[in-house]
Amino acid sequence: TNLYLAAEQRNAVVTALSAGCMILTGGPGTGKTTTINTIIKLLEDLKLSIALAAPTGRAAKRMSQVTGYEAKTIHRLLCTQRSSEGYSIFTHNEENPLPYDVIILDEVSMIDVNLMSSFLKAVKTGARIILSGDADQLPSVGPGNIIHDIIESKTIPVIQLNKIFRQAEESLIIVNAHKINHGELPDLSVKSSDFFFLRRKTPQDSAFTVMDLFKNRLPKSYNVNPISSIQVLSPTKKGLAGTIALNKLLQSHINPYDERRPQHVFGNITFRVGDKVMQTKNNYDMVYSREIGEDGMGIFN
């Protein structure tokens, strides 16, 4: 193909084909996906068996979409089973290693030390490991700061992608993300289709602005379903602009009470059919039925 790779991307490809283990890191829009796809193609040409994995179901799904290859969660890659004592154990370990010649892990910043330890124990002798992620992201919820610590150890090759490509430069989200990473304040007066800043004087005004954006303005401007396409984030739980109050406000406007729809009250929270909920734990055994009768497997976070 006529694919163009920047110098640091070419360096990453060469390193991936020559080193036993490497880290590929860089912020959004720096070409990590293009680099990974190039590496996968060359590894396939060498007839090597490849596995792709990520720490969460959503990250694995995204990895599958952008590479065109199946990606699994690390737990599924290692094959989680219940022991006779009821504990979760991995069937792939030192005694039963993974069969792959190359394993590519994405979103490494989200992996804690316990999961990384289990993964490394399951890698067969002579296999190649490629770790990809953004070192500037928050560390894992569990113990450890894997990608940062490995980079600081200076024991394996690290390729840092810094160049923001032209297509990514058109996204103000990506531009501002890099500004923040470099300690610069974004220009909040500049508005674009994917980033704009609205200032309100009170938390109550902020909450109603969020509701109006969610229910009316964003769906109308972008022709999207607010339930499936818009996610509201708040830095706090409490207060008029916190997640608890915002959830109640949005529910009252988007999914109000209807005697024809069942609802259940748990404490101070009312759940209704049609509410948007957050799945916080992967469940590979759960089968869900779609309206047309087809079955689908798994619910992932």
Located regions from the model:
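Conserved helicase motor core of P-loop NTPases
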Residues: 1, 15, 132-298
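N-terminal pre-P-loop "Q-motif" helix
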Residues: 3-18
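Short gly/ser/thr-rich secondary-structure transition/capping motifs
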Residues: 4, 82-91, 259-261
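Conserved helicase motor core of SF1/SF2 NTP-dependent helicases
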Residues: 23, 38, 42-48, 54-66, ...
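Walker A (P-loop) phosphate-binding loop of P-loop NTPases
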Residues: 29
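Conserved lysine of the Walker
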Residues: 32
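A structural connector/turn signal
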Residues: 92-93, 118, 266, 295
